[in-house]
Design a protein with these regions (language model features):
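An interfacial alpha-helical scaffold signature
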Residues: 1-161
């Protein structure tokens, strides 16, 4: 059965309409940070989780999903040691972990692998994180999309977003 688009899907579609590729990634990362958590396919065990990775042009990409149902959908009929095979990490912690030396370290993120997938290089992720922290995103001040036009800013303010 086809999945109904959620708010994240709508942001992905908005990003696709943007002519500037860097701005597209800003929209996607802004939408990712608005999520309560990032979800990863666990190919390890419950005791020793291991997020699924892939390789694109020699780069280690980490598969990240916008919700747990997408992870289960991606797992399909495959058998994994942990059931359900989902790792859930709060969005701010996941952003930091992807840039650090830990388990989630990667060269790029592959967001929602499949038809509407987006690849976010590590450099873009690091630049976003720096700006996000500089604007107090880490303090929980809310959803932020960098480089909004004044009309977009007005829209968000008028609608209390």
């Amino acid at each position: 059965m086809p999945r109904l688009p959620d708010r994240f899907d709508l942001w992905i579609r908005k990003a696709r309409d943007c002519p500037d590729p860097a701005r597209q990634l800003d929209y996607i990362l802004g939408a990712m940070m608005a999520l309560p958590a990032w979800y990863f396919l666990n190919v390890g065990t419950r005791e020793k989780p291991q997020p699924a990775t892939g390789e694109i042009e020699g780069e280690r990409v980490l598969l990240v999903f916008s919700d747990a149902d997408r992870v289960i959908e991606a797992a399909g009929e495959a058998k994994f040691p942990a059931a359900p095979p989902v790792i859930s990490v709060p969005a701010p912690a996941a952003l930091t972990e992807c840039l650090g030396p830990g388990l989630l370290r990667c060269d790029a993120l592959l967001v929602n692998p499949g038809e509407d997938a987006a690849v976010i290089p590590r450099e873009q992720l690091a630049a976003f994180e720096r700006e996000w922290r500089a604007r107090d995103g880490a303090a929980g001040s809310g959803f932020w999309i960098p480089n909004l036009t004044s009309e977009e800013e007005d829209f968000w303010q008028q609608h209390g977003l």
